[in-house]
Amino acid sequence: AMAELGDPDGAMEYYEKSIKADSSYAPAYYNKGVLLDKKLEHDESLKVLDEAIEKDPKKPNPRFYKGIVLGKMGKHELALNCFESVHRANPQHLDSLFHKGIELAELERHEKAIEVFDKILDKHKGNINVVYAKARSKAAINEVNEAFDLLKVAIKHSKTIKLWARKEKVFEKFYDDPEFQRMVK
């Protein structure tokens, strides 16, 4: 909570004291790992998250967050492995499934990513982030009509998507397309 209240140094000190008091307390390692990531200390974050995983391997959060950090570092195959591991152990953990799809897309395995996004949308049709992610993968494999249909749905529910689409590398090839311009205007 201290980190969210603008005192990351106080939070770090608290986590370190917690670890010193009880070196087996996995949540302190997890929270410290998350905070290190927020401070852009990714390598150190991974080390601490690995300690959290070692202390309590059944908890999904440290492994999930390790996947997030690895993805930020461009280590998409390793990130994918983390998300697959979390999802196998916790099939109801939809965030791990979503991020599995994101990493598949980053690895340009768009057909597989679309399968993952469809699996989520079967259960949660209105998840706009998933709709947008699917639109990105459809655009990447040049299924333009489907990509635009999905993008329209996403934009209808969240104007922020317009901003994302304008900056999204996968949509660059459509910048001169009048329909795309209308959607993101």
Which functions belong to the PLM regions below?
Residues 5-17, 38-51, 72-85, 107-119, ...:
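Structural signature of tandem alpha-helical TPR/SEL1-like repeats
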Residues 21, 55, 89, 123-124, ...:
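Structural marker of alpha-solenoid helical repeat scaffolds
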Residues 27, 61, 95, 129, ...:
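Start-of-helix register in tetratricopeptide repeats
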Residues 31, 65, 99, 133, ...:
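Canonical tetratricopeptide repeat
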Residues 64, 68-72, 94-111, 115-123:
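Alpha-helical adaptor scaffolds
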Residues 139, 144-161:
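TPR/TPR-like (Sel1-like) alpha-helical repeat modules
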Residues 156, 160-185:
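Terminal, low-structured helical/coil segments at or just beyond the last alpha-helical repeat
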